[in-house]
Amino acid sequence: MQCALYDAGRCRSCQWITQSVNEQLSAKTADLHRLLAGLPVEQWCSPIGGPEQHFRNKAKMVVSGSVEKPLFGMLHRDGTPVDLCGCPLYPASFAPVFSALKPFIARAGLTPYNVARKRGELKYLLLTESQFDGGMMLRFVLRSETKLTQLRAALPWLRAQLPQLRVITANIQPVHMAIMEGETEIYLTDQQALAERFNDVPLWIRPQSFFQTNPTVASRLYATARDWVGQLPVRHMWDLFCGVGGFGLHCATPQMQLTGIEIAPEAIACAKQSAAELGLTRLHFQALDSTQFATAQGETPDLVLVNPPRRGIGKPLCDYLAQMAPRFIIYSSCNAQTMAQDIRHLPNYRIQRVQLFDMFPHTAHYEVLTLLCRL
């Protein structure tokens, strides 16, 4: 992939950009083999790749500059701003949004936050696009509610320019730290969730719910999990760290009993909405801590699917799963190192199948799906 920002030395986020996609995939595969060394794997499935560019469905932009000439991108360690509007990871549909937002910021009087001076209001712009219908969600991350009235007053102009903006919010992040969002979310539109659809499964994206940033590869990840589960005798399943329910909603059948657990209430609201649309009455999603939920249960499901954050599921949950001993475990991980550590804490399981998904091209990161079977 050619990137003018990288060539000019202005951005180094894509550290592997000088390697071909095939070289990147080979290096990631070798890394996964290294991490799972000593753990016998019955079947290595071929890795799954995706688009080289324009694949990312989300932009997280630091806003700097002035209210008359705002700049969207990032700040170097020394505070130097870099405009990332031309990043080739973004789809072409983002460009007109960025172009319209620059004069809008002046209209609304949203002074960019100055980190050095600790002054200003607008900290970040967070933009998400649905590949299903092209609808977008825009979040203004503000230091306070001071400019809310001005923001609301200026919105009709922005919505006339960008009718694809379905969900617009103001997130309040008052802390002088590099934190992307605060707890308070103020909706500025009637619609509060963005409609998405993978493999004919309806999904919803709300402001504070995690959603994969590479929809092409994510849809194949979910479809693969559905295929694997469909080959197993599963009547009762847990989906832990379930997010908006992507895995569970793909894997569930009308006959299956499935419980999805996720600590973020916004994500659970999305999952419940999808389950209702699908008419799956035996799906139950709850906003709880996954480890606390699992260790408090007296019943053993046929299959436990886990999709934890980078830190992994941790030894307490590993120990409980080893003791509870469901027949199958599917582990989806964005950090194969912690996944390998967790699997080593499950000595009564064998690895039946492993597949790598290149969710994060041009970086060392990748997603991996692993099927474990009880010995």
From Swiss-Prot:
<keyword id="KW-0004">4Fe-4S</keyword>
<feature type="binding site">
    <location>
        <position position="307"/>
    </location>
    <ligand>
        <name>S-adenosyl-L-methionine</name>
    </ligand>
</feature>
<feature type="binding site">
    <location>
        <position position="3"/>
    </location>
    <ligand>
        <name>[4Fe-4S] cluster</name>
    </ligand>
</feature>
<feature type="active site" description="Nucleophile">
    <location>
        <position position="334"/>
    </location>
</feature>
<keyword id="KW-0698">rRNA processing</keyword>
<keyword id="KW-0808">Transferase</keyword>
<dbReference type="GO" id="GO:0070041">
    <property type="term" value="F:rRNA (uridine-C5-)-methyltransferase activity"/>
</dbReference>
<feature type="binding site">
    <location>
        <position position="87"/>
    </location>
    <ligand>
        <name>[4Fe-4S] cluster</name>
    </ligand>
</feature>
<dbReference type="InterPro" id="IPR029063">
    <property type="entry name" value="SAM-dependent_MTases_sf"/>
</dbReference>
<keyword id="KW-0489">Methyltransferase</keyword>
<dbReference type="InterPro" id="IPR030390">
    <property type="entry name" value="MeTrfase_TrmA_AS"/>
</dbReference>
<dbReference type="Pfam" id="PF05958">
    <property type="entry name" value="tRNA_U5-meth_tr"/>
</dbReference>
<comment type="function">
    <text>Catalyzes the formation of 5-methyl-uridine at position 747 (m5U747) in 23S rRNA.</text>
</comment>
<keyword id="KW-0411">Iron-sulfur</keyword>
<protein>
    <recommendedName>
        <fullName>23S rRNA (uracil(747)-C(5))-methyltransferase RlmC</fullName>
        <ecNumber>2.1.1.189</ecNumber>
    </recommendedName>
</protein>
<keyword id="KW-0479">Metal-binding</keyword>
<keyword id="KW-0949">S-adenosyl-L-methionine</keyword>
<feature type="binding site">
    <location>
        <position position="11"/>
    </location>
    <ligand>
        <name>[4Fe-4S] cluster</name>
    </ligand>
</feature>
<feature type="binding site">
    <location>
        <position position="14"/>
    </location>
    <ligand>
        <name>[4Fe-4S] cluster</name>
    </ligand>
</feature>
<keyword id="KW-0408">Iron</keyword>
<dbReference type="GO" id="GO:0051539">
    <property type="term" value="F:4 iron, 4 sulfur cluster binding"/>
</dbReference>
<comment type="similarity">
    <text>Belongs to the class I-like SAM-binding methyltransferase superfamily. RNA M5U methyltransferase family. RlmC subfamily.</text>
</comment>
<feature type="binding site">
    <location>
        <position position="212"/>
    </location>
    <ligand>
        <name>S-adenosyl-L-methionine</name>
    </ligand>
</feature>
<dbReference type="GO" id="GO:0070475">
    <property type="term" value="P:rRNA base methylation"/>
</dbReference>
<feature type="binding site">
    <location>
        <position position="262"/>
    </location>
    <ligand>
        <name>S-adenosyl-L-methionine</name>
    </ligand>
</feature>
<dbReference type="InterPro" id="IPR010280">
    <property type="entry name" value="U5_MeTrfase_fam"/>
</dbReference>
<dbReference type="InterPro" id="IPR030391">
    <property type="entry name" value="MeTrfase_TrmA_CS"/>
</dbReference>
<dbReference type="GO" id="GO:0005506">
    <property type="term" value="F:iron ion binding"/>
</dbReference>
<feature type="binding site">
    <location>
        <position position="241"/>
    </location>
    <ligand>
        <name>S-adenosyl-L-methionine</name>
    </ligand>
</feature>
<dbReference type="InterPro" id="IPR011825">
    <property type="entry name" value="23SrRNA_MeTrfase_RlmC"/>
</dbReference>
